[in-house]
Amino acid sequence: MSPAAAAADGGERRRPPLGGREGRSRARGYGGPAGAAALGLALLGLALYLVPAAAALAWLAVGASAAWWGLSREPRGPRALSSFVRDARRHPRPALTASPPPAKSPVNGSLCEPRSPLGGPDPAELLLMGSYLGKPGPPEPALRQDPRERPGRRPPARSPPPASAVQRVHHVYPALPTPLLRPSRRPPHRDCGPLSSRFVITPRRRYPIQQAQYSLLGALPTVCWNGGHKKAVLSPRNSRMVCSPVTVRIAPPDSKLFRSSMSEQILDTTLSSPSSNAPDPCAKETVLNALKEKKKRTVAEEDQLHLDGQENKRRRHDSGGSGHSAFEPLVANGVPAAFVPKPGSLKRSLASQSSDDHLNKRSRTSSVSSLASACTGGIPSSSRNAITSSYSSTRGISQLWKRSGPTSSPFSSPASSRSQTPERPAKKTREEEPCQQSSSSPPLVTDKESPGEKVTDTTTGKQQSSWTSPPTPGSSGQRKRKIQLLPSRRGDQLTLPPPPELGYSITAEDLDMERKASLQWFNKVLEDKPDDASASATDGPPSTSPPFTFTLPAVGPAASPASLPAPSSNPLLESLKKMQESPAPSSSEPAEAATVAAPSPPKTPSLLAPLVSPLAGPLASTSSDSKPAATFLGLASASSITPLTDSKSSGVSQAEQSVSTPASTASSPTPKPSMLFGMLSPPASSSSLATPAPACASPMFKPIFPATPKSESDSPLPSSSSAATTASSSTAPPTAASTTPTFKPIFDKMEPFTAMPLSTPFSLKQTTATATTTATSAPLFTGLGTATSTVASGTAASASKPVFGFGVTTAASTASSTMTSTSQSVLFGGAPPVTTSSSAPALASIFQFGKPLAPAASAAGTSFSQPLASSTQTAASNSGFSGFGSTLTTSTSAPATTSQPTLTFSNTVTPTFNIPFSSSAKPALPTYPGANSQPTFGATDGATKPALAPSFGSSFTFGNSVASAPSAAPAPATFGSAAQPAFGGLKAAASTFGAPASTQPAFGSTTSVFSFGSATTSGFGAAATAATTTQTTNSGSSSSLFGSSAPSPFTFGGSAAPAGSGGFGLSATPGTSSTSGTFSFGSGQSGTPGTTTSFGSLSQNTLGAPSQGSPFAFSVGSTPESKPVFGGTSTPTFGQSAPAPGVGTTGSSLSFGASSTPAQGFVGVGPFGSAAPSFSIGAGSKTPGARQRLQARRQHTRKK
């Protein structure tokens, strides 16, 4: 400090002498030859720059630097430049030869001495100069001197002649390159002492004396200030600075700012402003300087008013106790001085914006007022962005500020601060009230109205108590605010009042509250529009109700279960009606309802009903057309014993689709999860009775994009509504299976409808697999809705209707005894926790952009494109690519399993496009239990053998592949091969696009058909996992997206372990427990036995079942053969290899951020003996726990 101050002081004093012509004459007097030399050098630089004779790049560089510097200096003193030029022209050589500069300072001497001998050959001098420039050592000291002198000179720059100045100028030419200048300047403050000593040789001796004085003052900037403008202001600053370290830091930027302002006045902005900024030792200072400069520009008058500045400072001093105490509180609070300034600067800008009473505003109230001015309600206003972003992630912060301001006024003894605060706050509160109301945080409004009183009442009250509870923080906050008010305008950084913020701790709760508020706001906006559209569309609510009523009759058959469903069904209808009436509220409700729904089935229906109601609107529209049926919209039935409830789209003529099975199905309303941007309602599993039939209705993502508007297209239905089936199973494990309304066949019209956009489940008929369990998943095309697949009770299989479901994948897992309903919801933000009841997990895969949801028990939610692993028991696994690659797969131990891969792009468990393109609608029902395949587009049906024999149904689905389930796989391949020639595909082995079906590897995928990217697994990045029955038959057919398959000869990106298929980012896992790898952009969550994989992460195989999935191997090769694929076999591509922890399996995933290691802790190599490397861009393989922690950290950072 002292040396820097001294240097600064020296600079200041220099300024006056240099500033006047006296200075010039004086400079010449003591450094006339030096001045001449400097001028000569400048001229040489210009001449060289202009003269082609100096062709060397060094010459050009030197000349250019000199010219640039000279031009930059010009504004200060055009005269000076002209004088330079004139002098140089008159006697360039003498100037060069003159050696007085060396005498003046060793550094200068060193630079200049060579020059004097070289005076003859100017070019040589220039070269030397260039060399010096290149050399950091000598030029830096010179530069150090220069910056100080420059500050001094800047005003004087008008008169460049001073010899010392000239010398520096010489150095400056070389030094001009910013890189040198910056370091040099930074050193100057540090090295002021030695530099000053160097200077001592010449008149600089004065400077040391001044330095001592200023050092006593304790602020370098003060000196600059004094030299430039406001010594008086600086002196108070200095005293303050001396009082508090914070001030010291703040001051230098101020001085620099003042310098810059002076330079601007001088019109020397080009050099001076950069120089002033450059010297700032800390980036913070530079930032502060920029802000201050802006403020000064806006409030130049205020800054220039020394009286006002002094008054403010005086007030601070007068308040003395308050002002100083404010600083003391900072120290007491443990707030670093540096920290305080930053908020101060921001607040200053705010305060500067409101320039009513500088004094009043500057008082702490100003800070409060600035906060208040920024409606810090639900969304922090831009007024204090940085602070609001960090602190007011919770709206409460602004309130705290306000609160602390008013409350502190009583606390703070200083009357001045008090008087100031009430004045500004009252005004601010009035101003802010509307803002806060708009922000939609009533507590905030109340707080602002009566900050002291209401704040305590409102949530801010908590904050206040928390941060006022320490007496020092509260008082300090008040005092600080005062300080901030005064100096902030003056550019005094001393008055930054972070303490209230510091005192207030932002908790996760605050962040959550803020998020919720924002989400609610979004939901209202989004829901109102879609709901309105749906309402308009849903002119035929009765039609929508019929489906429910339909389901209700089904419910009727089961006596006790029926009774349970009946109430729920009524709530559904009622809720649908209500929802139609007021869609917006329902959307907000669904998340809450979904969460609450789990407790009791009746409750669940009611809760679900609101969820469904948004669907109902779209459904109503669809039903009005009667073409689309929201099939099973509300229908999730847990049939006590009955396997699958009849699900029928009421509107659709496809009554056929509904599976009529002993339908004592409780039609539990499927919640339509309304997903507003960030909020996902967790699917509620209602298992009121002992039978744990998890009814997970996953919230559906409310289609934002698709409008429900046209009843004819009825597109909204599929998009908006997904049948999230909640099975409220009153008793037996029997599971309710409901399928969501399916996507209308775009290509092929369903007979019932003419409308192309949506079709209820594509296949006209749902086939019920007699097989003990079948999984049905219906993806919705919109990708907004997730198709919920319900598991039929063990006895009956529910046919699964895949919907096109652009972004959604549904996995249905069924346990023979237990039902699982899986619903996927797409939500951008959070994933709903999935609750699973009983052994059968309900899977909700959510489409989340960001965070993976933690799977409840067995259920895993898919995050962005995260696949769910299904519960261990359920036999059926579906993998869907789901629009962005989220797939949930279920592997079940149930003896009979059906695995239906869903088309990744078009997600279909069962052929989504069953019929379109004349694919035969009838699914080929294998006699084998649970084998139900509906060909879509030419999907080969995978169900070929009884459980043991794995059937590989590979479909060429665009991204879809069917995983064959050994026991029975209905592998509807969408788009692709159909067991039935749909589309003319070969039935058994239909190769779509010429890919051989099943066993033949297509494009290097073994069992899989060519399928564009995937064989059995596929989905664009979805892997269908082959779920194997309880027998551990490795039925998993490996398919490659882009040809990854373990057996596959050629894998585009990776080879999957024979069972595992690497899909784009997905892998299918073979083996009794199949893990599905999905292509999830975000995080893979390792969940219950099935783990979901994040972007490329591979979900681990569940528990002990050996299975390898290598998900996404862009270049991951995981092959038992260990044949290198693209990236090499087990070797990690991109250098990550996941050790195979599990004997049973190694899962490698490509996760961009994290790689998942197999969840199970088996260290052994995979059954095939190869560890699947995961391709992770960023991270080495991490255990799921580590990954979760990582993700948690990331999320926390986001919160901040």
From Swiss-Prot:
Proteolytically cleaved by caspase-3 during apoptosis. Residues 365-374, 404-419, 463-477, 546-574, 581-598, 605-621, 658-669, 681-692, 715-742, 1075-1099 have a biased composition (Low complexity). Residues 379-397, 640-657, 1100-1121 have a biased composition (Polar residues). The keyword Nucleotide-binding does not apply. The modification Phosphoserine is found at residues 83, 244, 319, 322, 325, 345, 355, 367, 370, 408-409, 412-413, 416-417. Its main location: nucleus. GO terms for biological process: mRNA transport; nucleocytoplasmic transport; protein transport. Pfam families: POM121. InterPro entries: Nucleoporin. Residues 76-1200 are annotated as: Pore side. GO terms for cellular component: endoplasmic reticulum membrane; nuclear envelope; nuclear membrane; nuclear pore. Residues 1-56 are annotated as: Cisternal side. Residues 10-25, 143-152, 298-312, 424-433, 446-456 have a biased composition (Basic and acidic residues). It is a single-pass membrane protein. The chain crosses the membrane at residues 57-77. Essential component of the nuclear pore complex (NPC). The repeat-containing domain may be involved in anchoring components of the pore complex to the pore membrane. When overexpressed in cells induces the formation of cytoplasmic annulate lamellae (AL). PANTHER family: NUCLEAR ENVELOPE PORE MEMBRANE PROTEIN POM 121C-RELATED, NUCLEAR PORE COMPLEX PROTEIN NUP. Belongs to the POM121 family. This is Nuclear envelope pore membrane protein POM 121. It comes from Mus musculus (Mouse). The lineage of its organism: Eukaryota, Metazoa, Chordata, Craniata, Vertebrata.
